[in-house]
Structure formats: C-alpha cells, structure tokens
Amino acid sequence: MPDKEVKIVEAVPNFSEGRDISKIEKIIDSIKNIEGVKILDLNVDPQHNRSVITFTCGIERIIEAGISMIKTAASLIDMEKHSGLHPRFGATDVFPIIPITASMDDCIIASRNLGRLVGSELNIPVYMYSESAMVPERRNLENIRNKNVQYEELKELIKTDKYRPDFGPDSLGSAGAVIIGARPALIAYNIYISTDDIKIGRRIASALRGRDGGLNTLKTLAFYIEARKMVQISMNITDYKKTSIYKIFELLSIECRRYNVYPVESELIGLMPMDALIDVFNYYMKSNITRDKILEYKIFT
C-alpha cells in the first residue's frame, strides 16, 4: 500500500527579537530535529526588533513545532525589556498556519489545538485570529493587537471581557500573549520612500489602506526607520489575487508625487507565491507568462 499523502502546512511565526541573533538561532534549533520540518526563510529586523521565521512541515507535526518554538521564545525573550517599532503582544507575537496541501479546515483544527495546549501547558494567554477566530471581532488581527493596544496596555485590558483570552490565564507574564490562527497566504511587502517626514508617510499609508478606501485586502502602517533615515510603508497583502503588487506600487508612486517624494526601495519579508511575482512581471513586461515557462518550476515539478 502506498504511504498516505502528507498534508503540508506553512508556518510564519513572528518573534519579538531582532537584535540578538543567538536567541533566534535557539528558537530555530528547537524544531530542527522534528521530523519533516524544513526551514525556508529567516528575516531579522533590528529596527522593528522582530524576526520572522518561515518553515513547512506535515500538519501532524505543527503542534509539536509550535509548542517547542513558543516555549523556547518564552524562556529567552522578556517583554518587560522589549522595545521596537512594530506593535507586539508577546515573545511569540503571532503564529499563523497556512495550508499548502492541507485544507483550511485542517489548519483551523490544528491551530486551535495548538492554542489550547499553549494556554494549558505553557500558561501563556492565547488569542485565536483569522479563520480560527472564536470571537467574530478577532478575525482581523488589528482588532486584537494594534499600535494603541500592545503588551503594556494588555496587562490591564486582559482582565476585561473584550480582551479575555481564548485559552490560558487572564494575566500576563514576561512572555506576554500569543496570537494564533489559520489564514490564507499573505505577502509582507515594504517600500521605503524618499522622506524622513512620518506625517507624509502616514498620509500615503492611509491612501493605500483598504479600510480607509484604498486597495482592497491591503493593510498598511508607516514607520520612520532611523538606520535608513527614511520612512517605510509597511504592508500586508492579505489576498494577492485581489490586490496585485504592481497596483500597490503604482498607487504608492502616484501618492508620493503629491508630496514631491518617490519610492526608493522595495523589500519582501518572508516568502511570496510564484504567481504573485509572475503577475508583476506580466504587467510591466506586457507579457502573458505562466509558471510552466519558469525553468526552476519545470525542473522541480
């Protein structure tokens, strides 16, 4: 009998550490010996003091991997001492699980089981979000954690009905809280613009932001990055099939011209689907390339 097909998931946990690489290495080491785990990418950002690890594994191993990473992060990262530009709740800030060959329902079940164990075994408060939300308002991450509600504010808010965790205690330790959920593929994409004026950055970010009347399925924030002496427009594309990267870049360029600034550099945080890149290529090259014209795709499929 052939082996049962493994249901593959991707995980993209975000950790509140971007300055001490040894701590991130220990978090990665905690899952290296788990069967089927493949580390795909690491993005470390000292300004945001945040790291994003991308890995895949069979869905039957995601809970083991999640517990190991969250436990290790809790032992290494003290939120009382943490500072950084990016909003954050805890040592492991957010732990999304994305279906690859598994189904979304599979990922929802796995994420809730992970959340339950993190709460009961690690004694860390857990909020379920996106497709795994157990409270409707928590489907959107911004309704849980945002620039106005972070680790410091959560210390008191966690005792209220609105911020009662889905799992775990209603009090915070030095590891803070973790947000866990199943979600579709997301593209984290940043653009630096030629100004140090954060007010201009915020206006441009608002013009692009979906909830402010900009591009659908686009979430934006503006940060001043001291190391670059520039403003960064930080973006999450929650559905790249509805909101293409080229549309974002073109609209941002138009908005920049209103303030006599221009886009300087783009950066990708984590990984992106091949189809999203092909979409950008086809727009600018006026072509109709499909993935079966990509050499590496033909070789490895």
From Swiss-Prot:
It holds the Pfam family FTCD_N. Catalyzes the transfer of the formyl group from N-formylglutamate to tetrahydrofolate (THF) to yield 5-formyltetrahydrofolate (5-CHO-THF) and glutamate (Glu). The triglutamate form of 5-CHO-THF (5-CHO-THF-Glu3) can also be used as substrate. It can also catalyze the transfer of the formimino group from N-formiminoglutamate to tetrahydrofolate (THF) to yield 5-formiminotetrahydrofolate (5-NH=CH-THF) and glutamate (Glu). It can replace YgfA to catalyze the irreversible ATP-dependent transformation of 5-CHO-THF to form 5,10-methenyltetrahydrofolate (5,10-CH=THF). It comes from Picrophilus torridus (strain ATCC 700027 / DSM 9790 / JCM 10055 / NBRC 100828 / KAW 2/3). Its EC number is 2.1.2.5, 6.3.3.2. This is Glutamate formimidoyltransferase. GO terms for molecular function: 5-formyltetrahydrofolate cyclo-ligase activity; folic acid binding; glutamate formimidoyltransferase activity. The active site is at residue 86. Pathway: Amino-acid degradation; L-histidine degradation into L-glutamate; L-glutamate from N-formimidoyl-L-glutamate (transferase route): step 1/1; One-carbon metabolism; tetrahydrofolate interconversion. GO terms for cellular component: cytoplasm. Belongs to the formiminotransferase family. The keyword Hydrolase does not apply. It catalyses: (6S)-5-formyl-5,6,7,8-tetrahydrofolate + L-glutamate = N-formyl-L-glutamate + (6S)-5,6,7,8-tetrahydrofolate + H(+); 5-formimidoyltetrahydrofolate + L-glutamate = N-formimidoyl-L-glutamate + (6S)-5,6,7,8-tetrahydrofolate; (6S)-5-formyl-5,6,7,8-tetrahydrofolate + ATP = (6R)-5,10-methenyltetrahydrofolate + ADP + phosphate. Folate binds at residues 168-176. It is found in: Cytoplasm. Gene3D superfamilies: Formiminotransferase, C-terminal subdomain (3.30.70.670), Formiminotransferase, N-terminal subdomain (3.30.990.10). GO terms for biological process: L-histidine catabolic process to glutamate and formamide; L-histidine catabolic process to glutamate and formate; tetrahydrofolate interconversion. The keyword Transferase applies. Keywords: Cytoplasm, Folate-binding, Histidine metabolism, Ligase, Transferase.
